[in-house]
Amino acid sequence: MSERAPVVTIDGPSGAGKGTISQLLAERLGWKLLDSGAIYRVLALAAIHHNVELDNEDSLTLLAAHLDVQFITGNGSKGIKVVLEGEDVSNDIRSQECSNAASKVAAFPRVREALLRRQRAFSEAPGLIADGRDMGTVVFSKAPVKLYLTASAEERAQRRYNQLQDKGFDVNIDQLLTEIKERDDRDMNRSVAPLVPAEDALVIDTSQIGIEEVLNIALAHIETNLSGVS
């Protein structure tokens, strides 16, 4: 396939900083944003709202085909605004329950295929920042710029703990670490679109570096590989 606009893919495990960097890049460049992980969390939330079982691939696929989701940037420290059928669900989809459910529904091949078409439709001028787990390997495999962000499981658990605490959720960091390791194992070893860096992706370990440094590395890589982008 050929993309209709320049696409920068950002893949990696949960908590590596993909969401923050994707938002900052989209705002800095004035590009569209696709949060693939949020799409799966939105689908999981829609399934919960509509009483669809998380192991019912037929019903989940039908729900995915009609999923109405939008991403709105420019909200500053509040992050990306995620809208499902006209309702702001930005906080709802960040719960640990929804996060775990998203990983489960993402394991179904036909569900992924239904959402694949929707994700590719986000590629519009002037460009797209695509944040996910298989953006560079599957969804936008011909994207000119691919990044892969990673960090230790312990660092990612701490970040998730801080994030959920700030949002008022009562969480246990040891439980979070266990869930993150289990999710990594599921995502990296599933038969369909496992979580791995694309062969031509720039891998950035964010464990010991700050947001600004990661952003500068990403921008420099984009500018090097895409002419006319600054």
UniProtKB/Swiss-Prot annotation:
Question: Gene Ontology cellular component?
Answer: cytosol
GO BP terms: nucleobase-containing small molecule interconversion; pyrimidine nucleotide metabolic process
Q: Name one GO molecular function term.
A: dCMP kinase activity
Xref: SUPFAM superfamilies: P-loop containing nucleoside triphosphate hydrolases
- The domain of life is Bacteria
Keywords for this protein: ATP-binding, Cytoplasm, Kinase, Nucleotide-binding, Transferase
Q: Name the chemical reaction catalysed here.
A: CMP + ATP = CDP + ADP; dCMP + ATP = dCDP + ADP
Q: What is its EC number?
A: 2.7.4.25
Q: Which Gene3D superfamilies match?
A: P-loop containing nucleotide triphosphate hydrolases (3.40.50.300)
Q: What is its main location?
A: cytoplasm
Q: Where does ATP bind?
A: 12-20
> Could you tell me where this protein is found in the cell?
Cytoplasm
Q: Which family does it belong to?
A: Belongs to the cytidylate kinase family. Type 1 subfamily.
Under the heading NCBIfam families, the entry gives:
cmk
- What is the name attached to this protein's record? Cytidylate kinase
What's the encoding gene here?
cmk
